[in-house]
UniProtKB/Swiss-Prot annotation:
Glycans are attached at residue 19. It is found in: Endoplasmic reticulum membrane. The last loop motif confers selectivity toward stearoyl-CoA (octadecanoyl-CoA; C18:0-CoA) to behenoyl-CoA (docosanoyl-CoA; C22:0-CoA) as acyl donors. It is a multi-pass membrane protein. The gene is Cers4. This is Ceramide synthase 4. The modification Phosphoserine is found at residues 342, 349-350. Residues 67-128 are annotated as: Homeobox-like. It comes from Mus musculus (Mouse). Phosphorylated at the C-terminus by CK2.
Amino acid sequence: MSFSLSEWLWQETYWLPPNVTWAELEDRDGLVFAHPHHVLAAFPVALVLVAVRIVFERFVALPLSRWMGVQDPIRRKIKPNPVLEKYFLRMKQCPEETQMVLLASQCGLTLRQTQRWFRRRRNQDRPSLSKKFCEACWRFVFYLCSFVGGTSILYHESWLWSPSLCWENYPHQTLNLSLYWWYLLELGFYLSLLITLPFDVKRKDFKEQVVHHFVAVGLIGFSYSVNLLRIGAVVLLLHDCSDYLLEGCKILNYAHFRRGCDALFIMFALVFFYTRLIFFPTQVIYTSVYDSIKNSGPFFGYYFFIVLLVMLQILHVYWFCLILRMLYSFLHKGQMTEDIRSDVEEPDSSDDEPVSEGPQLKNGMARGSRVAVTNGPRSRAAACLTNGHTRAT
C-alpha cells in the first residue's frame, strides 16, 4: 500500500517537465543526480543542529551576553490569585477598566493592585533579554557561516549572476557534492526551527514566521527533489546575505550598542530591499515563470514552485513594510526604537499606573499624587533609557 502511494505521489507527470522520466535522472557513468530520498538525511541533521544550538547558547552565547553587558530586568513575583489567573489564561491578558474594577471587587483588591498584578503577570510570560540575545546569536552564527559557505560554492557559477542560465539543460543537471551538503544543512536548519518553534521567542509576526518556515522547507525540499538546485541555491543565498545582518543588529540592540545597531540596521534595510524586492522578483521569479518552460509546456510542479516563490515574495513585502516603519522612526528620532515586532517589557513601578485626578491642593498638586523622584532606584528597563540607549526587545 505504501509503495503504491509513493508511486502515485511521485508520478512523473506531476513533478517533471513533459516527456521527462525519473529513469533519465538515475546515476550513471560517474554522473550523480539529486534524488527525492536524499532529503530524508535532513531530519537527523536537524536534530544534530538542535543539540548544537543548546550547547552553543549555554556555553558560548550566554557568557558572551554577560560580557557585553546584557542584563535581564528584575521581575517581581506575583501573589497567586486563582480568579485573576483563570481570567488571564482563558479570557484576556489586558482587561478593560470596567472588567478590571469587577475583578478587583471579586478578589478584595484595589484597582491599582489588580492592574499591577496583570502587568507583572504579562511580564512573567515575556522572554528574558538574555534568551533573546542567545537566540539571535545562534542564528547570526549560522546565517553568516551559511552565507560565507554558499558564496564560496556558488561564486564561480555563471548562473548565480545570470539566473536565466539556471534552466540550461534542465532537468539533466548533475549534482555537485559541496552544493549537496550546503543544501542539506539549510534544509536541516529550517527543520530545526520548526522543532524549536514552541520554545523560541514569539514576536508579533509569529504567524508569518511559521508560514515562512514551512514555505522555506517546502521550497528547499521540493527544489532538491526535482533537481531545481540552481535556482533554489540562488534563492537561499539571497536570503542568507541579509538574514545575518538582521540578527547582528538584534545582538547590538540587546547589548545597547546604539550606533553600531543603527548603522547595521541601515545596511540590512538596503540589502533586504535590493535582494528581496528588486533582484528576487525581477530575476528569480521572472526567470522561473518564463524561462523555465521555454523548452516544455507548464506542468503541476511548475505551478507549485511558482506559488511557493510568490508566497515568499508576499512575506518579503510585509516585512519590508515593518522595516520602513522603523526607518521612519529612525529618521524622525535620530536613533532606532525598539523592534516593532517584539513585546516591550512593561515598567514594574506602581508609579506608572494611571491615577485618577483628585481635588487640587494649595501647591497645585492633585490629592494622592506623588512627586517624581529623580535620584531614586528605578527598574533596569527605565535605566536603559536614561543613558541614551533604546529599550532592547
